[in-house]
């Protein structure tokens, strides 16, 4: 017996060992719709027809894709296949690769909706409308930059299998104040920290579940020295031979 899901949140990772943090934010912020949704992750090496078959097997009404630089070509192929065999399924795109130059992207024309920027609140609102039979007129929907304290953290959506077998990504802050020309994050206005007690409580839960390798996706981990020291102290108090932290630093704050 197959489990059905009206909403599927999916992406094509570069390889199985990468677990999508973005999908888990979206899933954990669906509110009452979460029971009607599921996560499905694939890799860019999989056959498009196999991915489409697995997606449609759950008989979804909405499929949301996370689009990144490493998967946009493969994702466009998947969306083309979906629209040819299941045109009634609503396709929603989000992610950094289509948030800024969506008008010039071929994949945008194939989709029903595109959410630019932060998607947690905007996706939930869009799904509520679509499942209630409403059809928003605007194809491109700006993401809502709500205060981070309003977000449900994503970490409970990591399964025990994820913790055992995959890279687990975490973030203590969002955004970046720097304006490096080569980086999409230069379009951010500034960096916003998550409330630290709440963040460290979530890290402790992951630690208690057995996680020892933490990969921080913060654009600049040591932007605020006091916050950085507190996070490092948290891990130093729990340090064992398996502990591994990965983060990006700016040298002038060392």
Locations of regions flagged by a protein language model:
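Nucleotide-activated donor-dependent transferases that construct or modify glycoconjugates
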Residues: 5-15
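N-terminal [4Fe-4S]-dependent radical SAM core
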Residues: 7, 131-172
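Tryptophan-centric aromatic hotspots in well-structured domains and transmembrane helices
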Residues: 16, 70, 100, 124, ...
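Radical SAM [4Fe-4S] cluster-binding motif and immediate context
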Residues: 152-254
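Short, Lys/Arg-enriched N-terminal segments with co-localized hydrophobic residues
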Residues: 1-3
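Glycine-rich beta-alpha loop elements in corrinoid/cobalamin-binding modules
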Residues: 22, 26-29, 33-149
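Structural motif
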Residues: 12, 67-68, 117, 249-251
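Short N-terminal binding/cap micro-motifs at the start of the first secondary-structure element
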Residues: 16-22
């Amino acid at each position: 017996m197959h489990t059905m899901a009206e909403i599927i949140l999916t992406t094509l990772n570069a390889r199985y060992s990468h677990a999508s943090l973005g999908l888990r934010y979206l899933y954990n912020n669906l509110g009452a719709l979460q029971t009607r949704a599921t996560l499905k992750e694939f890799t860019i090496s999989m056959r498009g027809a196999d991915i489409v078959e697995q997606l449609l097997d759950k008989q979804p009404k909405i499929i949301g894709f996370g689009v990144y630089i490493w998967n946009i070509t493969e994702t466009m192929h998947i969306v083309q296949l979906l629209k040819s065999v299941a045109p009634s399924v609503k396709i929603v795109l989000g992610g950094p690769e289509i948030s800024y130059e969506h008008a010039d992207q071929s994949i945008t024309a194939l989709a029903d909706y595109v959410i630019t920027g932060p998607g947690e609140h905007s996706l939930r609102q869009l799904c509520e409308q679509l499942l209630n039979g409403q059809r928003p007129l605007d194809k491109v929907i700006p993401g809502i930059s709500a205060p981070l304290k309003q977000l449900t953290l994503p970490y409970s959506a990591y399964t025990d299998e994820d913790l055992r077998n995959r890279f687990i990504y975490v973030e203590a802050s969002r955004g970046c104040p720097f304006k490096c020309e080569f980086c999409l994050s230069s379009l951010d206005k500034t960096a916003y920290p998550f409330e630290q007690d709440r963040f460290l409580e979530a890290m402790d839960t992951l630690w208690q579940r057995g996680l020892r390798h933490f990969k921080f996706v913060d654009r600049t981990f040591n932007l605020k020295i006091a916050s950085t020291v507190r996070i490092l102290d948290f891990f130093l108090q729990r340090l064992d031979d398996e502990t591994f932290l990965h983060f990006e630093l700016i040298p002038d704050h060392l």
